[in-house]
UniProtKB/Swiss-Prot annotation:
Function: Oxidoreductase required for the transfer of electrons from pyruvate to flavodoxin, which reduces nitrogenase.
GO aspect biological process, one term: nitrogen fixation
Recorded catalytic activity of this chain's protein: oxidized [flavodoxin] + pyruvate + CoA + 2 H(+) = reduced [flavodoxin] + acetyl-CoA + CO2
Cited InterPro entries: Pyruvate:ferred/Flavod_OxRd (IPR050722), Pyrv_Fd/Flavodoxin_OxRdtase_N (IPR002880), THDP-binding (IPR029061)
Domain of life: Bacteria
UniProt lineage: Bacteria, Bacillati, Cyanobacteriota, Cyanophyceae, Nostocales
EC number: 1.2.7.-
Encoding gene (name): nifJ
Family: Belongs to the pyruvate:ferredoxin/flavodoxin oxidoreductase family.
Protein name: Pyruvate-flavodoxin oxidoreductase
GO MF, any single term: metal ion binding
C-alpha cells in the first residue's frame, strides 16, 4: 500500500529492517507505477540523517513521501 500512494521514497539500508525498502527499489527499477500512474522516485541515502533531510525536503515541495529505515 505504501508504495502505491507515495511519490518519493527515501531509503537507508540498515540491519535489522523490513524488506520494504528492497521491494520499493525493485518495483521502481521495474517501472511499476503508483495509483496515479507514475513511478515513485526511490533515493538511497548514506545516513538516517540524510533520509530525514530528504523526507523533509520532499514534503516541503508537496510530494507524498515515506521512508524505510530503522
Amino acid at each position: 500500500v505504501v508504495y502505491q500512494i507515495n511519490e518519493v521514497i527515501a531509503i537507508y539500508p540498515i540491519t535489522p529492517s523490513s524488506p520494504m525498502a528492497e521491494w520499493a527499489d525493485a518495483w521502481a527499477s521495474e517501472g511499476k507505477p503508483n495509483i496515479w500512474g507514475t513511478v515513485p522516485t526511490v533515493v538511497q541515502m548514506q545516513s538516517e540523517g540524510g533520509v530525514a533531510g530528504a523526507v523533509h525536503g520532499a514534503l516541503q515541495t508537496g510530494s507524498l513521501t515515506t521512508t524505510f529505515t530503522a
